[in-house]
Amino acid sequence: KLFSIIVLIFVLIISCNEQKKSSTSYLEISNKSQIDSITQTFIDREIYPFIYTRLEDSNGTVAYENLAKNERLLADENIDGDSWIRIWSMSKIVTICLALDLMEDGIISLDDSVIKYIPEFSDLKVATTQDSMEIPSVNWYEEDSNRLGPCPLSYVENDSVMTILHLLNHQAGFYYSTTNIDCIDSVIANENLAAAENSQDLINKMAKLPLIQHSGSYYYYGTNTTVLGLVCERATGKTLAELVKERITDPMKIEGLAYDLPKEATMLPRFSGKDSILRIAKEGELDIFGQNVPDYDSEHQLYLGGEGMIATANGYSDFLRMLLNKGTLNGYRFLEENTIDDLTAPHTQKDNSYGHNGYNLWVSKEPYLEKGRGDKGLWIGGGYEGTHFWIDTKRGFVGTIMTQMFWVYDGDYGYTKDDRIRGAIYEPWTQIPYSKN
């Protein structure tokens, strides 16, 4: 009996340690009404369908949360920190951290060749323009009457060995169907990657596509992290969903971060402002893959490491707190501190005055502070449907701004959402108001 009592006391102590320390956060937000008001402007102008903002301190205590929503479109929707959100590229940092965990265990390494795990990619060619240039060497969104168009394309051998490091840094040569070059966008659209049956089918589809550059030559944002997820699967013999559950969500007791929508749960609609009016997005309108988008169906065993996760603000904040706490959460060490340091160290875009890229994690510099958009040293990321996060290691908190919006029609104001809201949060600390210029 005495032994049972001791065990019970031990369990209670552990349980208390796993729960939030206090209902009151050490992080003081003194201007909540100002933040609420700025957020509401994006709703009143019918630029966004809803905006849910949440700040959590390192203990998981909510220091601030606010929902502003369009009553015309979402009157009957209850949106809060437990609502499931399509997070798109906010999946990338999860997959990257998973890969870093596998590296700590010696299962993969930065210098490993990608074809060691995916031999189907051994014959990938590099697409070049009719001027024999690498496609990322030119901004194809800018008009220039003095240059030839990129099409028709030519195809050459990749002059470098594609490595896992290239995947981490978006330098491998993979891309989305948004290059603004029809003869390459149409090729990836025709393969309809998000409709692949499983990882093998996805690999088969991607093996038919050209690379957009020689591996290692440029930073070019695309499906590189999706391929990284495929490498993790091949290296372990497990699916990404299994790896996330076994290595991340279960041991760190994170709920609200997954690939499949739980039974009985629902997803919010996709919205678009492409016609200068806020409305439900049309089928096929989200064109990042050219055709289909992820369906989050548990029967569809395709796990896109760069785009395919869903999360609640509550659950995703827990994952961010692991990074804030230098690799630990709820008494479990997931990554070593030196791994977190490497994750946020300068890897690409080192000469950008606004910040640098770690492993797909933006680290802000002085202009964020000077222009009233937050502070320097913030770790920042976001997703295709307007989701956003940041980590403030100086003040010890994480922030998420959630919405589900594809095309912002009033881009001049609409795309300042994250900077304006974040700027308002920081204004009492920095005494610097938001400045667009």
What is each model feature region?
Residues 13-15:
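C-terminal motif of bacterial Sec signal peptides marking the signal peptidase cleavage site
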Residues 325, 339, 344-349, 366-370, ...:
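Short, gly/Ser/Thr-rich active-site loops of penicillin-recognizing serine hydrolases
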Residues 63-66, 396-409:
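Short, well-ordered beta-strand elements
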Residues 39, 54, 59, 86-114, ...:
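Active-site SXXK
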